[in-house]
Amino acid sequence: MDASRYSYTSPEASHTHAYLWEPTLQVLLSSFGNSQPRRVFDLGCGSGAFANKLAAQGFEVHGVDPSLSGIEIARKAYPEISFDVGSTEEDLAGRFGKFQAVTSLEVVEHVYAPRQFAARVFDLLEPGRIAVISTPYHGYWKNLAIALLNKSDWHHTALWDNGHIKFWSTKTLGQLLAEAGFQDVKFLRVGRIPPLAKSMIAIARKPK
């Protein structure tokens, strides 16, 4: 998958931000407390809507995405925030440095090389800091409901250009993050009641 081909037309937030924003913000606020500065790396920032929300809350945000159209829109809409074209195929920490938190919302389901993705996230963090990674939730009861309602072809469609190529569970995403060196991996399920959640948010800490 060539993620640079992702096309964006608007800086507005996607529908997923409606249910991801508040729990993600609360996780970050709890992690930072009163410490300053509050530097966040938004990996897979798209057209910048989530980075802009973070900046409005006082975070110093650097957004990176492989989509040139997304970054061009983000720079135009939110000129006070730093945005760059980049991907986990390169040494992001070597290029941009270390951060107090890394966010990556609804990205990991799109990547071909998830272990490389997790390693890049790990490298971007200062010791003792957290990554916040969201992805569509897939669990037993939700998958059963999808099958019983005959929605599998819609939910797992193969016809979406540049669509989801990985379907994560808490077990597999937790394993990915643990293999990368993260500790204290926890999950939140958001968007609906937990068994039918739209997405899950992994909070993982880099050891001190």
Summary of predicted features, one role per range:
Residues 111:
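Catalytic P-loop NTPase motifs of RecA-like helicase/translocase cores
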Residues 1-101, 105, 114-118, 133-138, ...:
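Conserved N-terminal segment of class I S-adenosyl-L-methionine
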Residues 128, 139-141:
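Feature marks short, surface-exposed loop/turn motifs that line or immediately flank catalytic pockets
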Residues 118-130:
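A short glycine-rich, Lys/Arg-flanked "PGG" loop and its adjoining helix->strand segment in the class I
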